[in-house]
UniProtKB/Swiss-Prot annotation:
Span of the signal peptide: none
Family: Belongs to the DTD family.
Record GO terms (molecular function): D-tyrosyl-tRNA(Tyr) deacylase activity; Gly-tRNA(Ala) deacylase activity; Ser(Gly)-tRNA(Ala) hydrolase activity; tRNA binding
Keyword annotations: Cytoplasm, Hydrolase, RNA-binding, tRNA-binding
Species in which this protein is naturally found: Kocuria rhizophila (strain ATCC 9341 / DSM 348 / NBRC 103217 / DC2201)
Recorded domain comment: A Gly-cisPro motif from one monomer fits into the active site of the other monomer to allow specific chiral rejection of L-amino acids.
Name the UniProt record assigns to this protein: D-aminoacyl-tRNA deacylase
Pfam families referenced in this protein's UniProt entry, alphabetically: Tyr_Deacylase
InterPro entries with a match to the protein in the record: Daa-tRNA_deacyls_DTD (IPR003732), DTD-like_sf (IPR023509)
Quaternary assembly: Homodimer.
Motif Gly-cisPro motif, important for rejection of L-amino acids mapped to chain: 133-134
Record's subcellular location: Cytoplasm
Catalytically driven reaction(s): glycyl-tRNA(Ala) + H2O = tRNA(Ala) + glycine + H(+); a D-aminoacyl-tRNA + H2O = a tRNA + a D-alpha-amino acid + H(+)
Superkingdom of this protein's organism: Bacteria
Amino acid sequence: MRIVLQVVSRASVTVAEETVGEIEGPGLLALVGLTHTDTPETVSRLAGKVAGLRILPGETSCADGPSPVLAVSQFTLYGDVRKGRRPSWSRAAPGQQSEPLFEAFVAALRERGIPVRTGRFGAHMEVSLVNDGPVTVLVDSDELDRPRRG
């Protein structure tokens, strides 16, 4: 599971000229990618990490506020560009596997008291945001399993 987090002062998602999700910050835009090996345990662990990261103004977390999160599914986070000029999406989990896991991620954040808005799963979306900082952090479940260096 990969999540690109951006601290925002506001963000919104539009599908077919309809705003389907928006937040006023400070908050986080979370672009969420899932792969074949992700499980409900992976989702729960990363939801806890996202909720507790102290990257908002004043070194606070979403759980402290609570501050809102706009969660947007993004399979392209698992694009493989090692060969040729067209990315391969084979490392991204298919929709029937990733949609329930994405919904579980959203539910896990809400269970922690965090207000969450979402895009529309599988739709072509326009995401608008105003970065605050800018602060952008990549959270990768594979990296969390590795030992820390130095």
